[in-house]
């Protein structure tokens, strides 16, 4: 059997305050596409969407699709979203471990507000403050 999810390598730098609030993220994400690019270039926007689940403050993400001599991967459900979400959660766990805080506390402090959600998701419908 061939296929599977695309492996990624991420090199990142994250800025944060002593209370766990993240102020900036700079990341370089390399997607291993295998010998054939196939669906891989379409993963980039989905991967970015997975990263946007937290309010990073200032965010700079550079994603590269890397053609290698390995077997190609295929598209699976939510291609890119899983990798982006995993990267985001790994960074939050790293911040929590560095500060000695509970990871859920750090995650909660970095969830979007209505205003930050409008900045990170400008082309979508973001509801008002009622019930948010």
Can you say where each PLM-predicted feature lies in the sequence?
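Beta-strand segments within the central parallel beta-sheet cores of soluble alpha/beta enzyme folds
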Residues: 1, 23-28, 104-112
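Short glycine-biased active-site loop of nucleotidyltransferases that positions the nucleotide triphosphate
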Residues: 2-6
């Amino acid at each position: 059997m061939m296929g599977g999810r695309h492996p990624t390598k991420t090199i990142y730098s994250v800025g944060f305050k002593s209370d766990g609030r993240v102020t900036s993220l700079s990341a370089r994400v390399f997607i291993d596409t295998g010998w054939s690019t196939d669906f891989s270039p379409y993963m980039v926007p989905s991967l970015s969407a997975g990263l946007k689940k937290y309010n990073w403050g200032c965010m700079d993400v550079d994603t590269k699709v890397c053609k290698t001599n390995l077997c190609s991967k295929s598209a699976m459900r939510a291609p890119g979203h899983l990798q982006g979400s995993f990267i985001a959660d790994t960074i939050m766990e790293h911040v929590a471990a560095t500060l000695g805080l509970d990871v859920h506390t750090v995650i909660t402090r970095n969830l979007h507000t209505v205003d930050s959600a409008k900045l990170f998701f400008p082309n979508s419908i973001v509801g008002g403050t009622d019930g948010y």
